[in-house]
Amino acid sequence: MTVRMLHVLGSPVLRQQAARVAAVDDEVRRLVDDLFETMRAAKGVGLAANQIGVAQRVAVVDVGEEDPPPLALINPQIVERREEVQTAEEGCLSIPDIFGDVERHARVVVAALDVQGQPFRVEAHGYKARAIQHEIDHLDGILFLDHLSAV
């Protein structure tokens, strides 16, 4: 596992739509390991591959809850959203020292592949749902700043 360099606001890869992973292999598993290592070293709760310069649809989330445990999401897709939304402050490892209130769905169901290439679904509420939506936005080239209303 390697701690990778974080790309910050202004890096073109952060605005790229990440490519789907064709096959989950050892290279993708190493990427997942590096994402977890980099996220933890930076004291984050989520990280998308394009934040370390890799434009593939891979993200990790660990908000410190045991159920579900830390998540590796390969080719994640939100398949269900609760209409109810919640507004809370967000920040981003790629946008240091800037925070803002972002409205997100309170509950989401995500379909993805695990590190063995097996499909799974996860239902997330609250903070975990927020973190997952934030990371999937990254994979679509969207930053939390894009959700902020002009003041």
Can you say where each PLM-predicted feature lies in the sequence?
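Positively charged
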Residues: 1-151
